[in-house]
Amino acid sequence: SLLFKNKMLLLVTLANLLGALGFGANLVTYFFKYEIAADFLGENSLIGALGLSTIYYIMTGLPGFLGMLAADKIKKWCHGYVNALIVMQACNILARIAAYFIGFEGKNLWFAMAVIGLGGIPLGAAAIAQTAIFCDSIDYMEWKTGKRTEGITFSMQTSFTKISSGITAGLATLALHLLHYKPIEGASTYLGTQSAAFDRWIWPLVILTPAIASLLYIVPLLFIRYTPAQRAQVEQELKARRAATDSQNT
């Protein structure tokens, strides 16, 4: 019952569930296989169009490591991790909208991936920010009720992470079905082998569904009212309580 009284925890959990709607990442391999020519990197390239999906993940994901290293600075600039998460998602939204309009024709694909990578730098600190907010919610509930709920809180976090992954995978599968996707192997070229719906929608789904998910992710965060001043007050009072308890026990 304490979990359902923990508004901060519930709002961040809801944000994570809404973030799971960004299933485009699960469609990246399909996009590169069926929409990019096998000789995109040159006729004698050892990496075909399908191998570009690995390059995509590196270019769009690796820059996030910089954000991870700068997590504390991002928190300071944004005056707390809740605001930081909102800024992170906003950067992702702007980057993906820009990448969508850049497109993937010819060399534009490289620019689109680079833009997504740059916009994703702050997102590298997202996991750190979420964990910090979960810890804040535990402290807040202890301050409010006198009881700590680390075990059940992080158990809940793990469970909902699995649920989120299931939602993402399920939506990707549904999208492929609606696009009339048919697996094809052994073709000399895969361009033009899928339905018109697939060719039309696979790019916007890959690029824009994470942006939509980021927008939805922001909404629950707007209802978290926990300022750095409140956090400092809670930490100070908890420290005083624990010191008083320790002195009584000794």
Walk through the language-model features, giving the residues of each.
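Membrane-embedded alpha-helical bundles of multi-pass transporters/translocases
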Residues: S1-T250
